[in-house]
Amino acid sequence: MEYRRFGKTGLKTSMLGFGGFHLLEIPQKEAEKLLNSYLDAGGNYLETAISYGAGESERKIGRSVMGRRDEFVLVSKTGARDRKTAAENIDETLRNLRTDHLDVLLMHAVGTIAELDTILSEGGAYEA
């Protein structure tokens, strides 16, 4: 597996990431096999979002690989634009994923300058 530095974060991530959206389409046992096979092959970048199946993608990842938490970079997303909702999403995401931290949190589906301004403003999601 080939790896790259993740910006200035100090994280080293595999060139092949694993997106969790389609975990919604498969049973838990198959998700466990798929995720563990990806990690066994040297992959270490798992991405999901609270909006994927109302947290079901996160829950499948949490049930499947959290015993291997030190082996991968964990990324999730929130579509919240305000601090309160983003903080609630983060807390729920951590419960779903069965972990105490994310390595990266992405703001999901930011499509306008106005949305970005809201996220970055006082009381915006960035403060969460």
Kindly give the residue locations of the regions a language model identified:
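N-terminal binding-site loop/beta-alpha segment at the start of enzyme catalytic domains
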Residues: M1-E71
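Glycine/proline-rich, positively charged
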Residues: I26-K29, R81-A128
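Active-site beta-loop-alpha junctions enriched in small/polar residues
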Residues: F21, A49-S51, K77-R81, M107-V110
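Short alpha-helical scaffold segments that flank and stabilize functional sites
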Residues: L34, D40-A41, K60, G67, ...
